[in-house]
Amino acid sequence: MRKIAVITGSRADFGLLRSTIDAIDLHPDLDLQVIAAGAHLLPPNHTIENVRSQLRVDAVVEMQRSEVFGRTADAVAVGRGVSGFAAAFERLDPQVVLVLGDRIEAFAAASAASIGGRILAHVHGGDRAEGVADEAMRHAITKLAHLHFAATQESGERILRFGEPPSTVHVVGSPAIDGLDEMPPLDDSQHAEWGRPTTVLLLHGAGLPSATERRWADVAIEGVRGHGPVAIIRPNQDPGSEFVDQAITAAASEPMIQVLGHLDRPTFVGLLRHANVLVGNSSAGLIEAAALGCPAVNLGPRQAGRERPASVLEVETPDVQRITEAIEKAIAGKFEGGHPYGSGGTGRRIATLLGESRLEVSPRKRNAF
């Protein structure tokens, strides 16, 4: 049995990784290990309990501290994470460590795996996301990784240009598409309890100056007024999100606004199925919403450089009128073409590749420059 340690560090990556986790668990030649870390341990959501309610968690790695925010705090958290992951890998002894994306939890785990001589597999490498500081970490993880599970053809080609051997690069689609067809709309009673929202706002911190983060949040909330009822989902733990959260709290008592905390993936998808538009700066606007046929209005620089379908409209400056106009255009629009992120089945493809009898990868990296 080949031991595969899957790293989850947040509510977002857990939802994306779930299909891969399930496929690994069902594979007869793979032994699943789950390591939960980082933002899962932070209040107020403390999403580690959500993970534990669904899966056996084999190790927990503390990284961030809830009372400290910012890039310096993140750097300290990475150091804490490298140490914690190294200890977990020593105890669990996985043959392969699997990470997704660009967050500091993935970067810390990738660093510990690479230095510790373990095979590293990376999902969603090669993507561009110039609007966040984590862009550099995504590409750093790519250079540490031995196996690459790219979400799009363009991302796969970018990984090859990094000098990674072609035999290690697999275009498998995005796991964000997996299972969408099986997730129904939110049930009517829950939808009614939340005011039957037709507009969803999901805005995360983008690592911008505090005044700019708050300005974006204020104009975003002002922009969705009049397109309600509105569901506003509280942000993740990215730098700057505390200023977004302050603006959301200030608007929480308004009668046409329903503020929601952590939503698991099926509930979030069920909410989107009722929505006319998703507004914000989450990658869900580019991937899940597009796959569901829900147009999106992307705000600010956070998703800059990422591949996107025609159903995503851009607002590059914090301007209420431009946001309002983009929402109206999105709701009225008929958008041609699909999206570049595949048609599902990504988790099964990843598990199949991990379970191949000859995993022809050496922990000693070889570039193809």
What is the meaning of each model-derived region?
Residues 7, 15-16, 25, 63-166:
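Active-site and donor-binding regions of nucleotide-sugar-utilizing enzymes
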Residues 329-369:
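C-terminal amphipathic helix plus adjacent low-complexity
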Residues 192-245:
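Conserved catalytic-core segment of nucleotide-activated headgroup transferases in glycan assembly
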Residues 99-100, 107, 122, 148, ...:
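A donor-sugar binding/catalytic signature common to diverse glycosyltransferases
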Residues 40-45, 141-215:
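A nucleotide-sugar donor-handling region in carbohydrate enzymes
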